[in-house]
């Protein structure tokens, strides 16, 4: 019997980025420009970003999966080709009592 544990912990990243010459916008690390209130899910890094205005400045907020400590008899399994949060890893542990 296997026990699947999904940890719902998130890491919040913040950076202040304005897209060049376009007030009220943010630019992602890949160069995508987001308007205030828009969200973008990064398909290569299992994270999501949202552009918002804070104190009159555009702010790009990012959220990604938590870091995991995998106990003995367990393994980390990721869902390939999924977007955040479905791409976050799950800890799968085997039942050693049998």
From Swiss-Prot:
One of its GO terms (molecular function) is toxin activity. Contains 4 disulfide bonds. Transmembrane segments: none annotated. Coiled coil: none annotated. The keyword Zinc does not apply. GO terms for cellular component: extracellular region. Keywords: Disulfide bond, Secreted, Signal, Toxin. Expressed by the venom gland. Residues 1-20 form the signal peptide. Belongs to the scorpion La1-like peptide family. This is Venom toxin OcyC11. It comes from Opisthacanthus cayaporum. The lineage of its organism: Eukaryota, Metazoa, Ecdysozoa, Arthropoda, Chelicerata.
